[in-house]
Amino acid sequence: MAYIDPTLLILLVLAGLGIISHNMTVTLAILVLLAIRITPLNSYFPWVEKYGLSIGIVVLTIGVMAPIASGKITASEVMHSFLHWKSLLAILIGVAVSWLGGRGVSLMSNQPSVVAGLLVGTVMGVALFRGVPVGPLIAAGLLSLLIGKT
């Protein structure tokens, strides 16, 4: 009987979830990982694991900051954000979520046993509920509050 690679099977199932849910983000990410896995590029996985999250955060930050950089959101609009209660609340929530993300990075580094569950939950959330894959850091931060670890 032929050997079935369980990791490849998991990636295929996750890609299937992305396709079924019409979530191009998950589908493309999983397909790229599949391509890396089944080609000689698999020797680059340590690099992807080490720098992928940082590169992803940089790209996400560029996307979020682009409206300010392009002038679509003006300097006066940024300054006025400190005067409106909804904007002040958004700032406070942004600070809290960033803090949670920091705790999440720490927890994921110090307790790798939780990473698999966080990743599966995040991919399911992205695939099934049209979420975005920033979930592992925030989820890990929330988990760190619940289990009392940093």
Curated annotation (Swiss-Prot):
By its UniProt entry, which InterPro entries does this protein fall under? UPF0756_TM
Q: What Pfam families does its record include?
A: DUF441
Q: How does it sit in the membrane?
A: Multi-pass membrane protein
What keywords sit in the KW lines? Cell membrane, Membrane, Transmembrane, Transmembrane helix
- Membrane-spanning residues: 1-21, 51-71, 82-102, 127-147
* Subcellular localization(s) per the UniProt record: Cell membrane
Q: Which GO terms describe its cellular component?
A: plasma membrane
The entry sums up its family as follows: Belongs to the UPF0756 family.
According to UniProt, the name of this protein is: UPF0756 membrane protein ECA1265
Q: What is the lineage of its organism?
A: Bacteria, Pseudomonadati, Pseudomonadota, Gammaproteobacteria, Enterobacterales
